[in-house]
C-alpha cells in the first residue's frame, strides 16, 4: 500500500482547471455540509420546507437565485400527515422532485448507505436536508477515547464525505444550547465545537419567543459573513434586511467621526485639544479619551477618504489635534504639520 503524501506544487495547482464552488442558493448555501442551528419550536422546520420547495421549483430565496434541482428532505421529527398539512399551507402546486422520508438509519448505522443509494437513483438531487441532526446520531454511544469533540467532528465529517463525493449540499438542522454566549453566537451550538469546525457553513437562527422577528447569522468557508433580519409572516420567513461583513463594519464606525466631517465642512483647518473639539462641536456624550481612541483607530478609514487630514502632536501636557480639509488638487498634497 502506497502511504506517501499526494502533493501538488503551487505552479501546477494554479494551472489546473477547476469548476467554481456550486451554490444551491447563490452566496448563501454552497456545496458541502451546512449546519443551521436554532432553539426548538422557533420555525426551523417551516424554513426548511419552504427552502426545499423554493429550490425544487427553481424560485429565488430572499431575492437570491437558486439552482433548481431534486431535493431530499429527511423530516425525522414529523409524520407524513404533518408534512402534508404544512405543504397545503405553503403551496398550491407541490413539485414531484421534492422527496420526503420520516425515518432513516443513523450515522454509522446505515444512513450513509441510504443517502448514497437515493443519490444514485436520483442523480439530479443536489440538496439533502436532514431535520434534525440529533435524530441521525447514536445517542446511546459514549464519548470514548475520541471525546465529545472527536465524535462530533467524525459524525459531521461522515456526512461531508457524501456531500463532497456527489458534489451536493447537505443541510443539517440542529439545536442551540440553553445557556448562550453573548460574545459569540456560534458558541451557542449544542455539543462541542467539533460540529461547527467540521461544517463548511454555519447558520444561527435566533428569535425572541414573544415576536415574529429573527436574525439569521451566516459564516462559512465559501460564503462571506452575513446577518439577515427575517420576519415570520403567514408561515414563511421573509427577508427584511441583509447585511454583509462590510455593511456590518460600516455600521460599527463611530458616528462621531462623521460629525467631525460635518464640522469641517465650513472650515479649511482646525487645531486644538480633544476637549476643545468637543466644546466647539457641542458634543455631550463623547469624552476626550473616546476622541483620541476613535481618531487613532478610524481616522484613516473615515476622515481621509472624505478629504479630512488628521495629525496629532503632544506639546507639554496637552495633545494637539489638527484637521485640514483638502479640496480638489489639494488632496494630492500630503504636507500637513503642527
What are these regions (language model features)?
Residues 89-97, 192-196, 302-303:
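Short, conserved catalytic or adaptor-binding loops enriched in Gly and charged residues
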Residues 47, 51:
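Hydrophobic positions on the alpha1 helix immediately C-terminal to the Walker A/P-loop
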Residues 30-34, 69:
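Pre-Walker A (Motif I) flank of P-loop NTPase domains
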Residues 2-5, 11, 19-20, 24-25, ...:
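Conserved inter-motif catalytic segment of the P-loop NTP-binding fold
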Residues 35-37, 41, 45-46, 72-74, ...:
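Phosphate-binding/switch region of NTP-binding enzymes
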Residues 56:
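Gly/Ala-rich phosphate-binding loop of Rossmann-like dinucleotide-binding domains
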Residues 230-338:
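DNA transaction DNA-binding modules
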Residues 80, 84, 108-112, 149-157, ...:
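Amphipathic alpha-helical transducer elements in NTP-driven molecular machines
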Amino acid at each position: 500500500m502506497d502511504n506517501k503524501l499526494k502533493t501538488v506544487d503551487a505552479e501546477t495547482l494554479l494551472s489546473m482547471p477547476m469548476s467554481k464552488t456550486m451554490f444551491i442558493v447563490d452566496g448563501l448555501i454552497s456545496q458541502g455540509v451546512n449546519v443551521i442551528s436554532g432553539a426548538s419550536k422557533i420555525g426551523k422546520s417551516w424554513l426548511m420546507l419552504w427552502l426545499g420547495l423554493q429550490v425544487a421549483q427553481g424560485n429565488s430565496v430572499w431575492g437570491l437565485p437558486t439552482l433548481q434541482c431534486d431535493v431530499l428532505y429527511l423530516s425525522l421529527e414529523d409524520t407524513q400527515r404533518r408534512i402534508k398539512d404544512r405543504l397545503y399551507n405553503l403551496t398550491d402546486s407541490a413539485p414531484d422532485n421534492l422527496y420526503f422520508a420520516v425515518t432513516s438509519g443513523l450515522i454509522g448505522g446505515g444512513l450513509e448507505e441510504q443517502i448514497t443509494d437515493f443519490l444514485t437513483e436520483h442523480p439530479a438531487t443536489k440538496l439533502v436536508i436532514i431535520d434534525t441532526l440529533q435524530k441521525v446520531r447514536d445517542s446511546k454511544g459514549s464519548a470514548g477515547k475520541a471525546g465529545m469533540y472527536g465524535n462530533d467532528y467524525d459524525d459531521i465529517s461522515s456526512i461531508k464525505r457524501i456531500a463532497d463525493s456527489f458534489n451536493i449540499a447537505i443541510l443539517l438542522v440542529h439545536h442551540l444550547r440553553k445557556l448562550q454566549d453573548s460574545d459569540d453566537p456560534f458558541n451557542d451550538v449544542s455539543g462541542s465545537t467539533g460540529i461547527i469546525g467540521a461544517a463548511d457553513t454555519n447558520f444561527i437562527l435566533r428569535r425572541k419567543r414573544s415576536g415574529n422577528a429573527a436574525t439569521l447569522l451566516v459564516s462559512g468557508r465559501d460564503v462571506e459573513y452575513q446577518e439577515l433580519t427575517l420576519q415570520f409572516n403567514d408561515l414563511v420567513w421573509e427577508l427584511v434586511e441583509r447585511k454583509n461583513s462590510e455593511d456590518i463594519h460600516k455600521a460599527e464606525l463611530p458616528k462621531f467621526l462623521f460629525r467631525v466631517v460635518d464640522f469641517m465642512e465650513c472650515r479649511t483647518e482646525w487645531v486644538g485639544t480633544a476637549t476643545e473639539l468637543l466644546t466647539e462641536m457641542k458634543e455631550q456624550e463623547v469624552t476626550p479619551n473616546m476622541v483620541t481612541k476613535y481618531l487613532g483607530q478610524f481616522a484613516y478609514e473615515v476622515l481621509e477618504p472624505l478629504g479630512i487630514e488628521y495629525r496629532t502632536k503632544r506639546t507639554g501636557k496637552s495633545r494637539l489635534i489638527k484637521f485640514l480639509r483638502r479640496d480638489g488638487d489639494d488632496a494630492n498634497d500630503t504636507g500637513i504639520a503642527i
